[in-house]
Amino acid sequence: MRIVLITGISGSGKSVALNALEDAGYYCVDNLPPHVLPELARYLAHEGQNRLAVAIDARSSASLDEMPGLIRALSHEHDVRVLFLNASTQALIQRFSETRRRHPLSGSPSHDADVGLLVSLEEAIERERELVAPLAEFGHQIDTSNLRANVLRTWVKRFIEQKNDDLVLMFESFGFKRGVPLDADFMFDVRALPNPYYDHELRPLTGLDQPVVAFLDALPVVHQMLDDIETFLVKWLPHFREDNRSYLTVAIGCTGGQHRSVFLAETLAARLSRQASVIVRHRDAPVAVDASSRLVT
């Protein structure tokens, strides 16, 4: 049986991930007490069900200490995958504020001032981080701080499609002026390359548009940087596989995240698509929603 365990921080998108798995044909259970999982897996296997997805959060805190051993035991009989979702505290506070929902560890509703509520929520978030931290090492980690729901569904789809020993390589373009991606394993600064922004005809375009592609593709220095990054990644990917890494994020940054970083992320994704399962995402470029994150095949 394929068992997908979804865990991480409340507000980071576990419900979105669970719904995506339900759409993919998984039998889904939210907030299942961990000690019940082996019995449920046996029952569903007996009933002919071969795909199970379970969301586990800090409300099961009394049983969280059992999870590492439980995951190891289940892995002897089943194909077990752990998806660990995280997000910045700022993003989580904003999401809870927008949805007007209480954090599961925040206790009873308070009638204090807004600042007091935020402090209480922040404390609950940090407490939950401590509780679920031991599970992070087992999981395929995704930082959802800047992800749209449809992008997260795309990533979950790739996660369940990949072979168990496969490596997912995610190229993310971004702009330094909007901050660096906190979940990047490698970060390459390409601001030294000529900037199409200073060409008035290219300024409103992105690195996905052919005129910008032609501009950058004609520059030898761009290809030198592409070759150097590709050589580095090809050399070290086997070592990450040997270390049982399932996911690697490579961030490519320019000033605004619109031209150079987008072009390099796209080009590197195409070049490395035979080396690993590849996703490309453009965090800051003003591109269509369906182009902001996609699978590369």
Curated annotation (Swiss-Prot):
Short name of one Pfam family for this protein?
Answer: PapZ_C
Family stated for the protein in its record: Belongs to the RapZ-like family.
Q: Which organism is it from?
A: Burkholderia mallei (strain ATCC 23344)
**Annotated binding of GTP, by residue:** D57, A58, R59, S60
Keyword match Transcription: no
UniProt-listed SUPFAM superfamilies: P-loop containing nucleoside triphosphate hydrolases (SSF52540)
Coiled coil stretches, renumbered? none
Q: What does this protein do?
A: Displays ATPase and GTPase activities.
Q: InterPro entries, from UniProt?
A: P-loop_NTPase, RapZ-like, RapZ-like_N, RapZ_C
List ligand-binding residues for ATP.
G8, I9, S10, G11, S12, G13, K14, S15
Q: What is this protein called?
A: Nucleotide-binding protein BMA3112
Q: Which PANTHER family match?
A: RNASE ADAPTER PROTEIN RAPZ (PTHR30448:SF0)
Q: Which UniProt keywords apply?
A: ATP-binding, GTP-binding, Nucleotide-binding
Task: Give the matching Gene3D superfamilies.
Answer: P-loop containing nucleotide triphosphate hydrolases (3.40.50.300)
Q: Which GO terms describe its molecular function?
A: ATP binding; GTP binding
